[in-house]
Amino acid sequence: GSNTECFWKYCV
């Protein structure tokens, strides 16, 4: 997406 959000080992 436009921004990168990282949660634990998952980046979206």
UniProtKB/Swiss-Prot annotation:
Superkingdom, natural source: Eukaryota
Keywords: Disulfide bond, Hormone, Secreted
GO biological process, one term: regulation of blood pressure
Main location: secreted
Subcellular compartments: Secreted
Entry's Gene Ontology molecular function annotations: hormone activity
A GO term from the CC aspect: extracellular region
Cysteines engaged in disulfide bonds, as pairs: 6-11
Pfam families hit by this protein: Urotensin_II
TM helices/strands, residue ranges: none
UniProt function note: Urotensin is found in the teleost caudal neurosecretory system. It has a suggested role in osmoregulation and as a corticotropin-releasing factor.
Family: Belongs to the urotensin-2 family.
Name by which UniProt lists this protein: Urotensin-2B
Organism: Catostomus commersonii (White sucker)
Lineage, highest ranks first: Eukaryota, Metazoa, Chordata, Craniata, Vertebrata
